[in-house]
Amino acid sequence: MLQLIALFQKKGFAIVFASAAQESDFSYDLKSINVVTKKIVLNSNSFNDFINELNPEIVLFDRFVIEEQFGWRVYENCPNALRILDTEDLHSLRLTRQNAVKKNIAFELSDLLASDIAKREIASVLRCDLSLIISEFEIKVLAETFKIDPNLLHYLPLSYDFILENELLDFHQKKDFVFIGNFLHEPNWDAVKQLKEKIWPEIRNQLPDATMHIYGAYPSQKVLQLHNKKEKFIIHGRAKNANEVIVNAKILLAPMRFGAGLKGKLLEAMQAGTPSVTTNIGAEGIKGNYNWNGFVEDDFLAFISKAVLLYCEEAIWNESQKNGFEILKNRFKSDLFENLFLDRVCFLQSNLENHRNLNFMGRLLLHHTALSTKYMSRWIEEKNRL
């Protein structure tokens, strides 16, 4: 979201960030970057008054559930506003993969067609004028599996411009293994379980002096119970400085068995000059045709072997670090895609009616969804008054 805010500000847009969520001590100070914040309420006509008065040129929905809640109100009150959906990742892809892992069955893309979440998510994509997709693989899924018109999609990955290669620690200055990820995110919890039960015991047998450091916000009791100082498996909880944690580690381990989108931890490891060992799910959408900054292994025996090799062999480690820099420079620098995005926005603003006419299914869905959601929302609003 901060990346998008910066892009719009670069084009001269004033930004208003409206949210129904409660702020926490860890919320980003948007006012420090000249963003106006507004508290909004679910299922309330007060949003209609707010959006009418604001009369925005562009409305960006942060994930499809927000579009479900507020999209029809934007449609009714600001019909000429360009509606953009920031998908972050395809929730249906992540959840369908998760379900396959839990059932111990192979995942097939056709499984998505039976997903209720996919139906909601794709409906949201169709209702919006443009959907931002951060993974090339997900662009392919939307176009080939769901037959979404490419004109409704725009590839806009995470950007990583700051690589201070000369200021990074070298092989001998770094130590230990690290994993980092929010524990409210199920793929992260599953990955830590795999580390604890299947991967770390064997790595520790071969590298008894190494420690496995686990960082992540919102660790539940079941996560904290995995902490074992004797086994050198350390649960730290939230990292005060995530970049510092990754910079100091010799290797990042990410045995992701399911997920979607781009794994920020792996891109941040590249930026920090820290090689990684992950799975094909972890590397998805990141490496393209470039060599990984370490190893990609789905088989855990091979995963363990490559983690030990990377930890011990300086030449392989150095080459892996360089591979990560190459991936970031050639695939994730902002100047590779930010102007394309801004040009696309300007084009759509100038050709909005024609663009919408070419998306008849989207207009049909918007019409009927607006009616059904509207009356459900009004029923909730009236119920709350009682």
Regions found by a protein language model. Give the residues of each.
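N-terminal subdomain of nucleotide-sugar transferases
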Residues: 1-27
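Conserved catalytic-core segment of nucleotide-activated headgroup transferases in glycan assembly
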Residues: 2, 6, 16-17, 144, ...
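Acidic donor-binding loop of glycosyltransferase active sites
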Residues: 56-57, 129, 247-261, 274
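A short, active-site helix/loop in glycosyltransferases that binds the activated sugar's phosphate group
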Residues: 69-70, 115-150, 223
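Acceptor-binding helix/loop patch of EC 2.4 sugar-transfer enzymes
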Residues: 83-115, 172, 182
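Short hydrophobic beta-strand element within catalytic cores of glycosyltransferases
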Residues: 265-268, 275-279
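Conserved acidic donor-binding segment of nucleotide-sugar-dependent glycosyltransferases
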Residues: 293-301, 309-314
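C-terminal amphipathic helix plus adjacent low-complexity
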Residues: 318, 323-386
